[in-house]
Regions:
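Short, flexible, basic/aromatic active-site loop/helix in glycosyltransferases
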Residues: 170-187
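N-terminal anchoring/stem segment of glycosyltransferases
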Residues: 7, 12-124, 201, 237
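Short catalytic/ligand-binding loop motif for oxyanion handling, primarily in non-cytosolic enzymes
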Residues: 32-35, 83-86, 134-138, 143-145, ...
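Catalytic core and acceptor-binding pocket of nucleotide-sugar-dependent glycosyltransferases
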Residues: 183-267
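A short acidic, often aromatic-flanked loop/helix-cap motif at beta-alpha or helix-coil junctions
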Residues: 101-107, 160-161, 247-254
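GT-A fold catalytic core of metal-dependent nucleotide-sugar glycosyltransferases
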Residues: 113-167
């Protein structure tokens, strides 16, 4: 194992297949309160006390089973899971990596984990997903192979950017291209962080820039991942191309479990 400056232990995990090497990254954090809206009925796994229950396989079962079914490599970052739980569910292809306590929200900190892991482990294709409400329908390697000109692939949310309090953060942190966002916010769909992927170099750059942006923002209690995502893909990486929704992911919160024409189902 390797230990980085944040205290994360890393397993060098490679797929030596003759095909493109693809990794799915996710997280299962239980030591801090779940940061999503407690009044949202679509949030899965949040207990009455605000925390996600420890050692609860049902929390990740659908995601886990879909990884196994598609014979994919995956890494799940965790903080409060028991060694017995990890030993029971870890396989040659699905690895659990425990992390030390952290200051950011559960949603934000996972990207620091992803960045650090990829700096030590190189793949061809990288996707991150939520573990509680995302299912992998089929190997997303094909999606990337069939779309050479696209850098990022993402889930599309169910609302427009203007319906999300994005501009508050844009103003607060003095981000660039404010006028562009104001002009387009009623037409732009909100990009959802629950599924994002691309080629290794693009995703490592994405995670590095996410972490850099997040550190500059300060205020670690702010659950910022959705805000930073919009800013990165629509402004910082405006010379790169991204697609969202079909064929990457099902319609968000429509629970389209029967779909086989997309690569991921997100709620």
């Amino acid at each position: 194992m390797l230990v980085d400056k944040l205290g994360l232990e890393f397993i060098i995990c490679r797929n030596h297949s003759s095909l493109m090497n693809t990794i799915i990254l996710s997280s299962y954090f239980t030591e801090k309160i779940h940061p999503n809206d407690p009044n949202d009925p679509n949030v899965i796994g949040r207990s009455a006390n605000g925390y996600v229950k420890k050692n609860n396989f049902s929390y990740i079962k659908n995601w886990y089973d879909s990884i196994v079914k598609n014979n994919l490599n995956a890494v799940l970052f965790c903080d409060g899971l028991s060694e017995e739980f990890i030993k029971t569910h870890e396989t040659d292809k699905i690895k659990f990596i425990k992390v030390e306590p952290f200051e950011y929200s559960n949603n934000d900190y996972r990207f620091f984990c992803f960045r650090n892991y990829l700096e030590n482990n190189e793949y061809d294709c990288v996707f991150h997903t939520d573990a509680s409400d995302v299912v992998v329908v089929k190997d997303p390697t094909e999606l990337i192979q069939d779309n050479d000109s696209i850098n990022y692939f993402a889930c599309k949310d169910s609302i427009k950017l203007a319906e999300f309090p994005y501009m508050q953060a844009h103003d607060r942190f003095n981000w660039k291209n404010k006028v562009m966002f104001l002009i387009n916010q009623n037409n732009w769909d909100l990009i959802n962080m629950g599924v994002v992927g691309g080629r290794y170099e693009d995703m490592l750059l994405f995670y590095k820039k996410f972490c850099e942006t997040r550190i500059i923002m300060g205020n670690p209690e702010f659950n910022s991942d959705m805000w930073v995502l919009q800013y990165l893909l629509r402004s910082v990486f405006n010379e790169k191309k991204f697609i969202m929704g079909d064929p990457v992911c099902s319609e968000f919160k429509k629970y389209e479990k029967q779909r086989k024409d997309v690569y991921f189902i997100h709620k």
